Amino acid sequence: MGHKESPWHIYNNNHIRFKMKKVLIAIDYNPVSEKVVDAGYKLAKQMDAEVVLMHVVADVAYYGIQYPTFMGYEGFDASIDLNLSTEMRNVAKNYLETVAKHLNDPSVGTQLGYGDAADAILKYAEEWKADVIVLGTHSHNFLEKILLGDVASQVLKHTKVPVFIVPVKK
């Protein structure tokens, strides 16, 4: 990536300016992730920043939901034995690779996390030293909120870095 001057800068409490160099885009299997990826990638390009796409493999029961094709990703075979964590990792890796190809930028990295989505995102953001986390926020029904929690609100509550929220609807 070049070293052009970016209009995006963050000021901390001491009024010290720093340039954002790393953008972490967290996505799930929901088709609205396309909007999140596109918005996050556009933001990163404006900042001349490095990009990593992240997906977290969490409760396998959540993955029983079927979605239509988006960004070239055709979903997964419903006959997959979702109890096999190896198979879930393979499905998730394939998903991340497909989404990265959608961006047509070989410099885009991918990261697969495990466990609680918010915790995994926060942990990787800290390890990678992300300058901004990009998330989508979409409404779940009441039962989904009780079972899954709201990842975006948990990340916002516990993050040490700025969060760029992309509002999306199902």
Placement of each model-derived feature along the sequence:
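Gly/Ser-rich helix-loop-strand patches that form or flank binding pockets
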Residues: 5-9, 123-170
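Structural beta-alpha unit
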Residues: 6-19, 94, 98-133, 170
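Small/aliphatic-rich secondary-structure junction motif
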Residues: 14-78, 105
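Active-site phosphate/pyrophosphate- and oxyanion-stabilizing loops and adjacent acidic/basic residues
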Residues: 41, 97, 153
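General small-molecule cofactor/ligand-binding pocket signal
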Residues: 54, 109-113, 164
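Generic structural signal for helix capping and beta-alpha/helix-loop junctions
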Residues: 60-61, 120, 142
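A short acidic, glycine-rich active-site loop
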Residues: 73-91
